[in-house]
Amino acid sequence: MSYSKIPAGKDLPNDIYVAIEIPANHAPIKYEIDKDTDCLFVDRFMATPMFYPANYGFIPNTLADDGDPLDVLVVTPYPVAPGSVIRARPVGVLHMTDEAGGDAKLIAVPHDKLSVLYKDVKEYTDLPALLLEQIKHFFENYKDLEKGKWVKVEGWGNADAARAEITKAVAAFQK
């Protein structure tokens, strides 16, 4: 599969495609899809034994502030297989900075055509408060045992802020 051939979405910035690298609740292994080969590589075994609280991946054909495609967490009822592409709707963004600079994490839910379970979720605040705390806690702590790495969570942004991140990342990729 060539992820470069997958558009960023069907109706940007409201309807996006996300290439999943790490399924929700998976073992603490950081996978990354290599942009040159389109292969799923083991990036590292995470030193801090934590699992991603939602499916983790990126929007193809985008470029975020950290020089990588825009990161997305997709909340689903079940873990999604690594390498899969899922159609989703952005509902928020977790603003963060790490040792490499700005590192926003979009929060999304499956498009209504995939599941009606999230049809009433329009903003990240419509998700369970505990899940939001788990996401924040994960990113505040998942690099704790890795020397030279750190994360500072700066706060949440709404669906409009998430859509603005998408628009900016698509424009940056097209430059």
UniProtKB/Swiss-Prot annotation:
Function: Catalyzes the hydrolysis of inorganic pyrophosphate (PPi) forming two phosphate ions.
Chief localisation class: cytoplasm
UniProt GO MF annotations: inorganic diphosphate phosphatase activity; magnesium ion binding
Catalytic activity: diphosphate + H2O = 2 phosphate + H(+)
Family: Belongs to the PPase family.
Alphabetical keyword list: Cytoplasm, Hydrolase, Magnesium, Metal-binding
Family matches, as SUPFAM superfamilies: Inorganic pyrophosphatase
InterPro entries linked: Pyrophosphatase (IPR008162), Pyrophosphatase_sf (IPR036649)
Required cofactor names: Mg(2+)
Family matches, as PANTHER family: INORGANIC PYROPHOSPHATASE
Subunit structure: Homohexamer.
Keyword hit for Transferase: no
One GO term describing the cellular component: cytosol
Localization, UniProt: Cytoplasm
One Pfam family cited in the UniProt record for this chain: Pyrophosphatase
GO biological process: phosphate-containing compound metabolic process
Residues at which Mg(2+) 1 binds: 66, 71, 103
Record PROSITE patterns: PPASE (PS00387)
Binding residue positions for substrate: 30, 44, 56, 142
EC number: 3.6.1.1
Protein name: Inorganic pyrophosphatase
Binding site for Mg(2+) 2: 71
Organism placement in taxonomy: Bacteria, Pseudomonadati, Pseudomonadota, Gammaproteobacteria, Pseudomonadales
